Amino acid sequence: MQIQQMLENRIEELEMKIAFQEQLLDELNHALVQQQFDIDKMQVQLRYMANKLKDFQPSNIASQSEETPPPHY
């Protein structure tokens, strides 16, 4: 009977480990799906920004470093 109880305890431990691993696997899968969704969204935003940058027209106003200082300097 002692061996039977030890085997039952061992099986119970293994079943618990499997249950925890299945839960962890589900959580990791959910995180992976969410990350892929975020990556897809960022790629769309990156393409949008790249297109905006291509269409960017430089301004006729000089940058502050290119401006001549005012007369009182």
From Swiss-Prot:
The species this protein was found in: Haemophilus influenzae (strain PittEE)
Classification via PANTHER family: PROTEIN SLYX
InterPro entries: SlyX (IPR007236)
Gene3D superfamilies: 1.20.5.300
Protein name, per record: Protein SlyX homolog
Disulfide bond residue pairs: none
Alphabetical list of HAMAP family matching this protein: SlyX (MF_00715)
Sequence similarity: Belongs to the SlyX family.
